[in-house]
Amino acid sequence: MKRTIFYPLLSLALILMAGMTTVAHGQDFNGTWSGVIDVGQPLTIVFNIQQTSDGVNITWDSPDQGVFGLPATATISGNELNVDMPISPRATFKGILEGEALNGTFTQGGYGFTLNMSRTGKVQNNTRPQEAAIESDTHRPYRNEDVTFTNGDIIFSGTLSLPDKGSHFPAVVLVAGSGPLDRDEEVLGHKPFLLLADALSRNGFAVLRYDERGVGATVGGDPGAPSEPLATDAMAALRYLKTRPEVDATQVGFVGHSEGGLIAVMNAAKHPDEVAYIVSMAGPGVPGKELGMAQTQLGFKAAGLEFGEDLMKLNEDFYTIIATEKDSVTMCNKLANFFHEQEGNPALQLYLKGVTPEQYIKLYALPMVRCVFQYDPAENLKRVKCPMFAINGTLDSQVACENNLGTIKRLVPHATVKAYEGLNHFFQTCAEWKGSANNGAIHETMSPEVLQDIVNWLQQVVKH
């Protein structure tokens, strides 16, 4: 659920902008260029270049991460190509064209990597077989309806999936993780909420999924809002479902992923008479400080890096400031002082992972980020009275499986909890620890076992 920069490199906090560049003259850079950088593991970088009479169009791909057509700008002068990639941390490439070779340096966050490229054929996009199977099925036993509902002056747009047979359906609202995200919770080409809606609707549930504030067809609202206002959005969705004649108004609940699991717990605690059941998929059970500290450690583990005592001390001091300072200005000032005091500490640059202190401060000053790491779910978890299913993958590098599930079970004794061996934060099957930036390289969007377990658990709950 962390809304931060991933390590190894190539965070996908993209700035969407036109890929038009300038060109001085003559050299032929046309085509698809591919090469590999070594960031502790091989990572393929691809530039797609088309020279025109008006200039040059350029996009770039990171196929190992499953992302394609990313925006870039560039300048060409003689046989030199300079590319700027507006990601965070910012990345650049400077290369020299020598025949059919384009050799240079890829730089991000102050680190430079040799990148020798050759002209190649078009790199194929990774397939998403689970989505493809759903989208190609012309005989689905349910129908999809475009719907709108409101929360204050925000008009939310979503998709309501209704089974073809029967009536008076139990229902769920799907609540996405840290975003803002669309109704499918699409990340790196994966659409986990499409899969959940399909699985549940095939098994007798009405399912509502919606574009979050400022996303897709939803009109209004701050896309950077913290969790509490987002929880009111989810309640508006649930209350809309209760107005539908096809829905059993006594059997409506939430399935939330990551921050969506946090929101499901919030609403179950605050509105016990309205929320019939909740499923928390990698939702947090521990306080925000503990969550953040574990995320950083797991990120280093995923990158194959040691996390010694010096880094542990930096980590604890950093998250203590974030967790305890409720005033944003005070927090930012204390973080600035913290980084200044640590300038001579050799562990600091390793901890920063190529990101500047200013970038860190700016990120954690965002309300939608700060709220997560200042939140302690304990009181809300203790107040959950409805049936609850809490799940985690053992290779989750964002919400540590053992601590979070253990805490949830302790605070909600009646909850059903399950840990899935070898699954990551998105419930994809992984062979080993990987950072979140690797999720796009995995063809699987969600483990079929997880999908079936959620269906089975909900079916058992609504029977009682």
Protein language model regions, located:
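Central antiparallel beta-sheet cores of small beta-barrel/beta-sandwich binding domains
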Residues: 27-98, 103-111, 141
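N-terminal cap/lid segment of alpha/beta-hydrolase-fold proteins
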Residues: 124-167
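Short beta-strand element of the alpha/beta-hydrolase
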Residues: 168-178
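Conserved alpha/beta-hydrolase
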Residues: 195-217
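Alpha/beta-hydrolase active-site loop
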Residues: 224-245
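Accessory cap/linker subdomain of secreted extracellular hydrolases
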Residues: 279-379
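Short beta-strand/loop motif that positions the catalytic acidic residue
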Residues: 384, 390-392
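Short alpha-helix in the alpha/beta-hydrolase fold that links the catalytic acid
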Residues: 386, 399-410
